[in-house]
Amino acid sequence: MLLVLVSVFIHAACSNIEEQATKPIGESHLSADDVYVGFVIDTLKEERWYSDKEIFEEEVKQLGARVKTLAANGNDDVQIKQAELLLEEGVDVLVVVPHNAEISAKIVEMAHFAGVKVISYDRLIRNANVDLYISFDNEQVGKLQVEEILNHVSKGNFAYVGGAESDNNAHLFRQGAMSILQPYIDRGDIRIVLDEFTEGWNPSIAQENMEKVLSNLNDIDAVIAANDGTAGGVITALTKAGLQGVPVSGQDAELSAVKRIVDGTQTMTVYKSIQSLAKHAAKIAVQIAKNEEIETNQTINNGKIDVPSILLEPIPVTNNNIKETIIKDGYLTEADIYN
């Protein structure tokens, strides 16, 4: 019975999408009051994504449009069904944080069939005719992580703890990191003793991978962790092994990570202004729904096309510039961090 009901729901959703597919993409001319924005987000399990959701929704509403956000909690099938639902409801533009960069191409296909444009938010959907991509310079993120770690140690055993292999950004972070590390590796100054992706960006898996290495080699000089979640898992493993204080990078400027930086167990994080990203994306979503022209600053190839892209600059954060960066920007307060 359940399978029958699911089948009927999907069939109904697809039928409604087919009914909508009568207008070519971009032909409507709407006022802001008429615009309905759909935001399909991978997960709300990580601290930063709550911020994206809240800021994005608030900005869309400030612009006079309607918005609905659906989170898939890391499930590809759920994310595709959520996109179907929003298309069935008649959204004018779809903003997507993909769980899987390849599988999410199906969402673009469905949206275009319904005459709806797609913005790839923060993570690039691969091998699809994505209309616009907005994110940060993600190779630069990896470079910033390594450069700060090298300020503390430039020889020895290094570990690279990556993000989810299904996330295109994880590959870009690694590319940026390795572009800086490679000369040190080539001349024998640095030995990479761990180089793995972390399934689902799960801190527990990052911890397990680190513990496996430490069980055979209790001599780690630095860890490049792709984000603050994986950094937290790594630091737990290092602390258990009596290696707290080993330089560890991160990303996202999560409150827990910034507190670790103050405590000296994490070396740095990379701040990507969620205010800037979410507000910019919201404005662009409404503009695209109204069929207005969008200025982009470059293109990024996603395996199929060169996607018009807007890339914002990431900022390295250490214990020396917390006040000048994330506090000044209003992302966190002194009370949040130091109390």
PLM feature spans:
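A residue-level marker of the well-folded mature domains of exported/periplasmic proteins
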Residues: 13-339
